């Protein structure tokens, strides 16, 4: 869980920007989207294989 402390004389927008950056770095949002629905192991393997193939192509 990402957590930030709002600094003295820091605007809410700046604090929100820092929070969003920390969430992105931690991968929290991406992980939540990935776990939103159950994915069968066979589908997971297929997606992983296609991603590797795509990376290799580039």
Swiss-Prot record:
Residues 31-42 have a biased composition (Basic and acidic residues). The lineage of its organism: Bacteria, Bacillati, Bacillota, Bacilli, Lactobacillales. PANTHER family: MITOCHONDRIAL 28S RIBOSOMAL PROTEIN S21 (PTHR21109), SMALL RIBOSOMAL SUBUNIT PROTEIN BS21 (PTHR21109:SF22). InterPro entries: Ribosomal_bS21 (IPR001911), Ribosomal_bS21_CS (IPR018278), Ribosomal_bS21_sf (IPR038380). One of its GO terms (cellular component) is ribonucleoprotein complex. HAMAP family: Ribosomal_bS21. This is Small ribosomal subunit protein bS21. It comes from the Bacteria. Gene3D superfamilies: Ribosomal protein S8. Residues 24-58 are annotated as: Disordered. Transmembrane segments: none annotated. GO terms for biological process: translation. Residues 43-58 have a biased composition (Basic residues). GO terms for molecular function: structural constituent of ribosome.
